Amino acid sequence: MTTFPTARDVRTTPEGLLWEPSERWVRGRKGDVTVVDSRHPVLVWEPDVPVPLYAFPRADVREDLLRPAKNPATGTHTGSRIFYDLEVDGELVENAAWTFPAADLAGHIAFAWFRRWGTGLDHWYEEEEEIFVHPRDPHKRVDAMAGSRHVRVEIDGTVVADTHRPVLLFETGLPTRYYIPREDVRLDLFEATDHHTDCPYKGTAEYWSTGGHANILWSYPDPLPAVAAVKGLLAFFNEAVDITVDGERLERPVTPFTGTVE
């Protein structure tokens, strides 16, 4: 009889890693070559890194494509890990994979998704969905809800958006984002840029700038199904603009984006 945990089933290793088994079918490809094909992956959280990565049983990895790393990665979190280069069709990918020293994770090989070391694989899939940037954290929620609050946005004292029909996006660990219909935004004050970002929970965003404020406004033209309600709507970085909701001025939050936008 299989027992399923009713709370977060996370284990800790001596080096401070958190990990838990996953039941998702995960595959990773380099070009047309499947390097990883696993129905028994393990999610791993490194110290002070907010997003997880996957480690896989050796039997689920094409170890014949791995070589001892010529220039092993050094720095934060590398510790006593053993790094491997990946060689596929004559192309060498440095530090594409590694093993952990922790006994709990012995027999597993991890691959980088967010490319701190090496260049990683080209495509990752959970079940039949392609996943970008990093694995989705099963303990994180993202909800998009239609609202009727009065939301006003100011930049340098100028009102750039005013709406009574926002969509509120609630994402674990981040401030509420207010997505506003285009008709309620002074888009004439903004200029589209070629900047794009990818999010494993929401999709690919496009950006606009105004004055000395680069990429301060964004939209998801084709969001993932879970947040379809924000399609085509516009949102601002709370960290860099003044937002008033139902007459109450919100404090600018401190987040990982603080300082990256102005």
Predicted regions and their residues:
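Terminal leader/tail segments of proteins
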Residues: M1-E262
